[in-house]
Each structure stands twice: as C-alpha cells, then as structure tokens.
C-alpha cells in the first residue's frame, strides 16, 4: 500500500489565504484594502526577519493577482483554479521565483528585463518574485531601476528582504513596502497549539513556551523545532523533551543547580541531560 511521504509542518501548514497569515494583521489589512480599492502597485517589497512569512505572502499576492475564480468583493484566492494551485506549489510558468543570494549579477537581472516585454502565457500578470533582493549587486540594481520606473502593465515585482538598509534608496522609492514582524510569544504559542490539535497531539504549556522562546518570533523556526520533537513523541510533548533537544536546562533544574552550588555539592546529583547542557 502506498504511503504518502511525510511533509514538514512548515510546508503542510503554509498559509493558503491572507486570513491564515498569523500575527500579520496590519499587513493583511493593508493588502486587502489595496486589492479592494484596485490600488495595487507594480512592485512590492516584503521586509522582515527570516521565517516570518515573506515567501508565503509573496505567493499569496501572486495568487490574488492571478486567481480566475475569486468571489466578487473578496481578495482571497480560491485555491482551486489552476493558477492558484500551481503558484502555491511554486510551479507556475508566469510566476518566476529567483534567489537573489545566488543570482546577484547584472546579467541575471538582464535576463529578467529581456522577458518582461512578453505577456503572461496563462495568467493576467507575469510576476517576478526575488528573494533576498538585498544581495543583488549595485549594477544589478541599476539595471532593474529602469524597468521599475516604467513597468509594463502586465508585470508585477515582489521583492523580499531581511536587510532593508542594503537596498538602494532609488529602489525603495519605487516600491510599496510592507513590514512583517516577528510573532508575539502568545500568538505563536496559540498557533502551535492549533497545529498540534489538528495533528491529534498535545503539549505541556511550558514546552510550547520553550519552543516559542527559542524560535524568537519565527514561525518557520518554531515549526522546525516542533518537527524534531515530534520524532520522539507519541501523543504529548513534554518540556523535558524540548529541553533535551535544544540542550537547555529547565527552570526547576536551574534552581536545583543553584542550590547545589550554594551547598557546595557535586554535579553527580543532577540528571545526565542537565550535566551535558552545562558542561
């Protein structure tokens, strides 16, 4: 019997609608208003730390622009038309995704410029998503500038960056900037709890707090930690599991260690995981 391969949580629960973008309420509200008022710019710049949803947001924008079955008065992509499905998978012929970290030169950008004159093959807009755009060379930015100044009507650019200060002001002045923030701890914990519920699992509150602290507001990092913990978990995630995975000491063990130090006792009295974490 064929068994479907395991899909990591970050991919399994990647947002498919704007309403699923966790902790980015201001961003979602602004994007909704721009679509509803038909004031969608030709270039977006998504700025935020790693793992907060920049790539997911870029694909949502691409889907909203090219969805063929959106309901009247709604900005949410249908996720059922061929455009939505292929964009979600990163396979749409008219949505070109490029890694600015590996393609930094002027020739890479010139390849894009040479193709913008051609209309989309199967969608309304041809969309270029450039991740880590701050890694482009100065000559590459200069080559891109002319197209951003006078873009074809059928072309949209979506840039993503973790380092806004490295992007030239001439580029920043020609894009609509959106800032994605790191998630508040309570919001992230609630999100993790919901995912565990859908997976038929549960977790100690302290375990989720530990994951949230380690992830520091990054959804992707939190789900990556959760994936690793689930390898050794049957039904309920305990904080001890998380601490052992991360090589950390729990609060109770920290207090116990302080007591041992005060009393001048040997480390032989503490657990092996704790001893490994502090030595």
Write out the residue ranges for each language-model feature.
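P-loop/Walker A NTP-binding region and its immediately flanking N-terminal helices
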Residues: 1-177
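Extended, largely alpha-helical regulatory/partner-binding modules appended to the mid-to-C-terminal parts
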Residues: 89-93, 111, 124, 160, ...
